[in-house]
């Protein structure tokens, strides 16, 4: 194991257990990169020393941009303390529309403290307590997804304006030559992480391609009257084909799509997710069909 993280809730509400966790990690995996997520309030010098001795390599603080100035100042003091003991000190926080000037000022403060970097999160409309967000005038980003699916990991939907502000902040950091790293984590990135966890290492037949771009399993499909001509051409090139008698289509590996450029047929790219129904049962669920043009298709683009 190369990486491990402890998050919450607030892990430092249970300091002995938190430091014990990292000690155990260090004992079993001496070279592991161990990370702690915290809001910062419970961190004191003794705890920071204990975390250092337990092998903690990175600490990430959460700062609420709408907190009172005195509370933010307190967290900044905790960050300054952490810099004395923990090799990598980061901040991770959502980008709330309308907070641009406050965020720019915070970036400058963090840079002055020598913080290694900040992870800007796309702000999300929660799947619960939506009324409180509506009251603040937040609206959904449209479209909410590039590919519609039951994304459970992120627990929300992207809020309009958050991504635009995040990119503005990245540009601000560049233009002002800030030394801290600035990373943007979109909701789409979290969705891709979920799909990757569901799909990677899952055995599938040779008609599927695991996309390194978005982690979907992808295959090509041809329907109806086009099947005969396409199947004959694929047979000449020894391309494996799967038949669906029920839905009247064939599917094959996307790398063969470019072979069909001379045929007057319509080809679709099928995007799929593995759903694990139990320890022994799984299902391949198609979540989107995309029309593709064989003459311009490239496997590297998907």
Q: Residue ranges of each PLM-predicted region?
A:
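Conserved mixed alpha/beta catalytic, RNA-binding, or beta-rich assembly cores of soluble enzyme
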Residues: 1-4, 128, 185-209
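Surface-exposed amphipathic alpha-helices with a cationic face
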Residues: 19-30, 52, 79-84, 170-175
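Short acidic, gly/pro-rich beta-turn/loop elements at beta-sheet edges
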Residues: 46, 71, 101, 128-130, ...
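Structural recognition of alpha->loop->beta junctions
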Residues: 48-65, 107-120, 201-218
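Radical SAM enzyme core and accessory elements
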Residues: 199, 204-302
